[in-house]
Swiss-Prot record:
One Pfam family matching this protein: RF-1
Compartments, record wording: Cytoplasm
PTM entry text: Methylated by PrmC. Methylation increases the termination efficiency of RF1.
UniProt modified residues of type N5-methylglutamine: 243
Function: Peptide chain release factor 1 directs the termination of translation in response to the peptide chain termination codons UAG and UAA.
Record GO terms (molecular function): translation release factor activity, codon specific
The keyword Plastid belongs to this UniProt entry's keyword annotation: no
Classification via SMART domains: PCRF (SM00937)
UniProt similarity note: Belongs to the prokaryotic/mitochondrial release factor family.
Protein name in UniProt: Peptide chain release factor 1
Amino acid sequence: MKPFLRSQLERYAQRLQELDFLLSREDIMADMQQYRSISREHAEVTQVAGRYARYQQREADLAGAREMLEDPDMAEMAQEEIHAAETELVQLEDELQRLLLPKDPDDERNAFIEIRAGTGGDESALFAGDLARMYTRYAATVGWKVEVMSANESEIGGYKEVVLRIEGQPGTGPSGSGVYGALKFESGGHRVQRVPATETQGRIHTSACTVAVMPEPDEHQAITLNPADLRIDTFRASGAGGQHINKTDSAVRVVHLPTGIVAECQDGRSQHSNKAKALQVLQARIQEKERSERAAKEAALRKGLIGSGDRSDRIRTYNFPQGRLTDHRINLTLYKLLAIMEGDLGEVLQALQHAREAELLAELGLE
C-alpha cells in the first residue's frame, strides 16, 4: 500500500473516537440537523475504519504465514494462507481507495430529470417519451418512485418537455449511490438513429433530445425565493393538441426574473398543488444553473472524461437498426438497445461511475 494512502487511513480510527464523543453530547443530540450530519459522517468513517482494520489483520496474517514457510511441516498450509491473504489484500486496497474518494454530498438526494425534445421534430418528441419511459422503468427495478412534475405533450405522442421527480432510499443505486448519484451522468445530449413510424421509404432519421439531471434540494439546502423576484402566471391546463382538460386556470407558470428561469406545472388537480410543484422545479433549476456554472469553470481547468453535464455535450447515441447503444464519453458500446430502453440501464450507469472513480483515483495519484 502506498504511504500516502496508509497515512490517510491512519486518521480514521482517531476521527471515529472524536465522532463517538460528539454523538454522546446532549447539545449535539438536541440539534437534529447537526446530529444527522455527524451521524452520516460516523457511518462513513466506521465503514472505512472497519475495512482498514481488516486490511491490517490480513497483513499480520501474511507476515505470520511467511514465517511458517521455514517449517517444512507447515510450508504447504503457509503457501495457501499466503495466497489467500495476498488476494484479499489486493481487493481490500482497491475497496479502501474507492472509499477515500471525495464524495459529492448531493449523491444521496432525490433527483429531477428534465427531458426536452431537440432537433428532429415529432420524432424527437417521441424519443423524449421513450427516454422518460426508460428512466421510469429503471426506477421501478430498483424500487424508486417516479412522479411527473410537468409535461408538455406532443400531438402525436411523446413530449416536447417533461420533468420527472425520482425518489429513492440512499444506497439503492449502482455501487451504493443514491438517486442523483446514480443518474447525474445522464445529463447531456442523447441522439437517436432509427426509421420513424411515419417514414414510408424506410430511411433512417437522426434526432436528438437533451437531458438535465438536478438534485432535489432538502429544506436546509433550498434557496429562499424573494416573492418580488417571481412572476406567477396562471392559465388553463391543456392536453396534447390543445384540448382543454379543465375549465379553470389551474396551470401555473413561475418565472424567476433575475435569471429568466421558468418552471410550469399543469398536471395537478389544483392551482395550489401546481404552484407548489412549479416552485420545487424552479428551485432545482436555479441551483442547477449555479452548479453547472461551477462545473464549467472546473472543466476548463481539468478536462474530465465524463464531462460537465452540459446540455450541449453529445454523450450518447441510440442506434435502433443496429440494436446499439454507444456512450461516447467512455467508448462504451452495448448491443442490447431494446433491453436498455425497457429499463435495463444498470450496466451503463455502473460503467460511468467506474470511469469517474478511475478519474478521481488518477487525480489523487492512487492509480
